[in-house]
């Protein structure tokens, strides 16, 4: 491109940095960053966000933090990128510190911000803070937003707070496979097998197609040998839908069959 005399612009560099968001390409990404800094374009917030995302995805959080803290003209996209990086590393204290700092600097959290917050609140130490954030969303326009709602449902599910998870599920005006799978998981984790199966059936009645995560969640609800037929039905459903080749689901099926002494059927999963 450059040999042909075409000078790469900001969009070009951002696209390349996105490709470099894999550890094996990090060296190339750093070279691009230095090249860009040489052209005095690292003052651009979009470029800075792309570089921070690259470092974060490659596991170089310290480098991402350094760039973030030394960049003056932050926008909400940059704040959200940093929140997401902390959230992905389960750094819930840093997430809340950054959230407070962001608001103090005049940036109101968006739904993307809240998804990061609730994802990190699955940490057992963050239950009270998560409830406080949820309460603050009651009168906000995206309090029942699909993506935010799924994150809240997952938050309550991981804390075994079944009543709150159920209330969130019922309040959501839009539901997708993640929503239904989350509710099934909530019931399964609390040992309510019958309710988990009912949600699984209703999900299909609503024409929502279960995925691998759904089936793994419903398998966890089959906590009694009397439910062996349900395990077989789930296995058969997975085969019909072409989901039986997934390693995680296959492992779950093997474990369930083995748990109830059905070694022959466990081997059949292979």
Task: State each model region's role.
Residues 5, 38-40, 71, 75, ...:
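Inter-helix linker motif
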Residues 9-14, 29, 44, 48-49, ...:
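Pentatricopeptide repeat
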